[in-house]
Amino acid sequence: MKALKGLLVLLIITGLLWYVYEEDYHNSGMAGVWGEVKQDAQNIRNSEPVQASITFISNSMAFMTDFLSGSSSEEYEAPSIPSPDLAEPNNQSFSVHNIEITDSIEDVEEVVGELPARVIQNEYETEWHIYHQQYQNFFMVAYDDNDQVFGLYTNQDLLRSNEGISIEATKSEVRAVYGDPIDFIQKGNIRYQVNNDQEYDTFKLDNNYVTFFYDLHQNEQITAVQIISKEMEHRKQGFFGEKSDELVEGLAYQLFDLTNATRAKFELPLLDWHQPAQTTVRQHSLDMAENNYFSHTNLAGLSPFDRLARDDVSYKMAGENIATGQPSSVYAHHGLMNSEGHRQNILNSDFRLMTVGVAVRQDGQPFYTENYITQ
C-alpha cells in the first residue's frame, strides 16, 4: 500500500514538473530545465507576494507526509460529554447553562458542580470564570463585588430564552422577536457607537446589553451570545479596557480558549498551548501596536515564517491570524471566524498547537497575533 502511495505521489510531481518545464526541455534539454528550475527558485526566494504559496507548499507537504504514513485527522473522535438539562429562565429573558444575571456565586457552584477551568482578567476590570469539559459545554461567568452574576457568555448550545431563541436561531429570527438592535451605548455624556453590522447585533433587554454573534458562513445563525449587565458595562470607561499586564495575559488565554471551544463545536482536535512561539507572536503584536501598522509582514520585511525561523521555532506546517480594533478577544475571535482565510486556520484539522500574543496601546486598543503550528 505504501509503495502504491509513493508511486502515486511521484506521478503527480512528475506531471506537475512536465507541465511547467515541457517547453524548456524541448528547447534546451535537461540542462535548460535545470537552469530554469534554479532561476525559478531564486525568484521565489526574493518574491514577497508568493509567501502564501510557500505556506501552501509547506501545508501540502505536511498533508503528503500524513498520507504516506497512513495517519489522518479523520481518525479523531470527539469525546462524548453529556449536555446539561436546560430549562427556561425564571427571572431574566435569558439563561446560560441554567444561570441568569443576578444569580449568586453559590447558585452557579450548585448548578455547575465544579471549579472554573480558568479565571482571567477582562476589559471590564473584573474577571471571567471560564467553565468547560474538554471545551464542550463552554461558558463564561463574571461576578460583581457582591458575588452576583453580571456577565455571561457561551458559544455552545447552553442558551435558553423565554421567547424560544436558542443558539440555532438566525439573525432574522432574532430581529423578528427583539426588533431593531441599539445603535449606541451611553455612558455619562458620551455615546459609544455599536457597530451592528452583519456580524452581530446588540439589544438592551432586562437592563442588560445582549449581543448575538452570527456566523456568516452558516446562514447568519447565532454562533455565540454575550450578556453584560448595565453595571458591568459601565465599569469600562471607554470603548477599550484599561491597559494592564493582567488584561494582556487574560485576552491571550481567552482567545486560545475561544478557539478550542469553537473547534470542539466542529468536532476537531483540540489545540495545545505552544509556549516556544509565544515570544514570537507577542513581539509581533507589540511591534504593530508601537509602530501603528497592521500586517503579517513586519517593518523589517519578515513574514510570520521568517519570524518563527529567527526564533528557532520548528514546524511542519504553520499559519497566522492577526486582528485589531475589537474591544475584546470575544469580538476578535468572531470577526476572525467570519473571515474566510482566518476561519480556515481556526478550523484546520491538521493543526495541533497554538499560541497567542497580545499587546495593548496606551489608548487601550489590543493587537492580537495567533500562530497555529504542527511539528
What are the language-model segments listed below?
Residues K5-V20:
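Hydrophobic membrane-insertion alpha-helices, especially the h-region
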Residues Q92-N98, L158-I165, F240-G250, A264-H274, ...:
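Second-shell loop/turn segments in exported
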Residues L158-N207, P304-Q375:
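A well-ordered secondary-structure block
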Residues G35, E106, E110, S172, ...:
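Solvent-exposed, polar/charged alpha-helical surfaces in well-ordered, non-transmembrane soluble domains
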Residues L247-D306, R352-M354, R361:
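Short, well-ordered surface patches within globular domains
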Residues L16-A31:
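Membrane-interface motif at the C-terminal end of an N-terminal transmembrane signal
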Residues Q198-Y200, L205-W273:
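Intrinsically disordered, low-complexity
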Residues N27, A31-G32, E36-N43, Q51-S95, ...:
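A cross-family detector of function-defining hotspots
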